[in-house]
Amino acid sequence: MNSYIYALGFFDGVHLGHQALLDAVKKLALPGARGVVTFLNHPDTLVLGQTPGLINTPQDRELLLKHYGMDKIVALPFDKKTQTTPWRDFLEDLLEHHGAAGFVCGEDFRFGARGAGNARLLAEFCREKGLPFAIVPEQTLGGSRISSTRIRKLLDDGDMEQAVACMGHPYILTGTVVHGHQLGRTLGIPTANLAFPKGLATPRFGVYGCTTCIDGKTYLAVTNLGTRPTVDGHHITVEPWILDYSGDLYGQTVTLEFRTFLRPERKFESLTELKTAIQANAQQLREQGKDFSGFLGARP
């Protein structure tokens, strides 16, 4: 069994605070021995009886963790067994079954039954076992702690720029392009259509400036996230108009990188008025996006 230094946490958003943990792992472990232990479902589902809307799908979270250099991702179910496992047994299990050879956590990290495990006890455990470890202080931006909760609020407010600043990377959303009403094509604005994943925190409805990588090339995308009130106004959809791209994306997986909030979603009096607004958004994005480069690059 290979050995790994593991960062511990849920890592929703993989924000700058999480990246500080990943950086600590990279200082302790050589490439090939860097890992993360996280959970398939949010602990609050059992601990508090409620599930917060998440920033990332599990697939996008894994994509980000790998982007930041993690070689192994252990995603455990947070179930009754996990919830009632004593903190020491939890660490021992990682040593025995997952090749753990050291740990990294944040200074406020709690784990084990009743949250009895903490950073101090983890440090004592590692000293006792002769294992390397690191306890990472919280990260702040603008004098306030960076947290997934803070980022969810920023997304809800439509403050994409500040959310991106807290994450240290764009807000990403991956989906498979499906057939839509093809209204955009009749307007000369062909859009791809993606379903908004269930269980995610919903950013403010509106039009966003995004980047996306297709066949190794980065494109700008004017993206409507909302219910399309001018057309039908029911289901949440994600519709990027990928500028200067003319290929067929049906059935393909696309990762959108949200960079900036262009305007709130609104109902227009006519499709002509809608088209004019979208074209204005495209010009706005071309100006703002001159310095944007693709974040993730080609999807593996």
Regions flagged by a language model, labelled:
Residues 15, 65, 103, 163, ...:
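Residue-level signal for inorganic ion chemistry
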Residues 43-129:
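N-terminal Rossmann-like or analogous alpha/beta NTP/dinucleotide-binding catalytic cores
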Residues 36, 75, 135-136:
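A structural preference for short, hydrophobic beta-strand core positions in alpha/beta folds
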Residues 126-226:
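Glycine-rich, Lys/Arg-enriched anion-binding loops that position phosphate/diphosphate groups
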Residues 20, 60, 162-169, 273-280, ...:
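A non-catalytic, amphipathic alpha-helix used as a structural packing/dimerization or gating element
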Residues 2-58:
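N-terminal catalytic cores of NTP/NDP-binding nucleotidyl/phosphoryl-transfer enzymes
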Residues 180-300:
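Phosphate/ribose-recognition catalytic cores of enzymes acting on nucleotide-derived substrates
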